A protein has these predicted regions:
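Non-catalytic alpha-helical scaffolds and adjoining flexible linkers that form interface surfaces
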Residues: 1-22, 26-238
Length: 238
C-alpha cells in the first residue's frame, strides 16, 4: 500500500462496525476521498474529533483497494465559531453536503477545494447575508452547471421579456414558454456576479428581500440537480 498526505475538508462520516468510521473528505490534490478511521468510536480522542464534518485537517492515509485508511490527522482549522452557532453550523453543513452529493468522485479540482475553504473561513469570521448563496452559485459555475442568464434557454431570445427563471430548464425563459418563477433584474445581476466569482460585490450588499430571492433560487437549482432537498438547509428556518 502507498502512504500519502493530503490537506482535506471533512464532508461526512458514517459508522462502520462497532468502533470504526468511514470518512468522506475533499482533498486539495485528490478531490473526493473515502477512508476508514479505525477505532475512533471506541474512545473520545483528538484523532476522532479532528475527523468530524467541517474540519480542515492534514491527513495521512494508506491507499487501499476500495477504502483508504486514515493513520493520522493534524488540525489546520476546526472552525469552532461555526460549530458553536446553530445558524452558521447549518450553513457550514450545507456547504459540505452539497459537495458530497453534487461533485463526482475521482479527479482533483483545486478550485472547488479553495472555494470551500475560503467560504468556511469567511463563515468562521462571521456570517454574511450573501455568503451561502454566493458559494452555491459559484460552485455551480465551477461544476459547469451555472444557469443561462442572458437569453431564453428554450428559444435563445435575448433582451426584454426575460423575467422568469426556471431551475428545471436551467436558466431564464421568455414569456412564450410556461413554468418558472418571476425573478427581478437585481437578482439576475447578483447571481451573475456570484457565478463569475465576484463574491466581494455581493458580500458587501445589505440584507434585504433580494438576499432571500437569490438564495432561494440557488437552493432550488441545487435541489433540482440533486433531485432531493439539501438536508442541512432544512434543519432550521430558511
Amino acid at each position: 500500500m502507498t502512504l500519502y498526505s493530503e490537506h482535506v475538508v471533512v464532508l461526512r462520516t458514517w459508522k462502520l462496525g462497532e468502533a470504526d468510521r468511514i470518512i468522506s473528505m475533499f482533498g486539495a490534490r485528490s478531490g473526493k476521498i473515502r477512508a476508514v478511521a479505525k477505532g475512533v468510536r471506541r474512545t473520545k480522542t483528538k484523532f476522532g474529533a479532528r475527523l468530524e464534518p467541517i474540519s480542515y485537517v492534514n491527513v495521512q492515509c494508506w491507499k487501499g483497494r476500495e477504502l483508504d485508511i486514515v493513520t493520522q490527522a493534524e488540525s489546520i482549522e476546526l472552525f469552532p465559531g461555526i460549530k458553536g452557532d446553530l445558524e452558521r453550523l447549518r450553513k457550514g453543513l450545507a456547504m459540505v453536503e452539497v459537495i458530497e452529493e453534487l461533485v463526482a468522485e475521482g479527479g482533483a479540482d483545486f478550485e472547488i477545494f479553495r472555494l470551500l475553504v475560503r467560504a468556511l473561513k469567511r463563515l468562521e469570521e462571521g456570517d454574511s447575508p450573501y455568503l451561502l448563496s454566493g458559494y452555491l452559485w459559484r460552485l455551480l459555475q465551477v461544476e459547469g452547471m451555472a444557469p443561462q442568464l442572458t437569453e431564453c434557454v428554450e428559444c435563445g431570445k435575448e433582451g426584454e421579456g426575460l423575467g422568469v427563471f426556471s431551475a428545471a430548464a436551467g436558466g431564464m425563459i421568455c414569456a412564450e414558454h410556461g413554468g418558472g418563477v418571476p425573478i427581478s433584474a437585481e437578482a439576475v445581476s447578483v447571481i451573475g456576479w456570484m457565478c463569475e466569482g465576484e463574491l466581494g460585490r455581493a458580500l458587501s450588499l445589505p440584507d434585504s428581500g433580494l438576499r432571500h430571492e437569490v438564495e432561494g433560487l440557488a437552493v432550488s437549482q441545487i435541489e433540482g440537480l440533486l433531485n432531493r432537498k439539501v438536508r442541512a438547509l432544512h434543519l432550521g428556518a430558511f
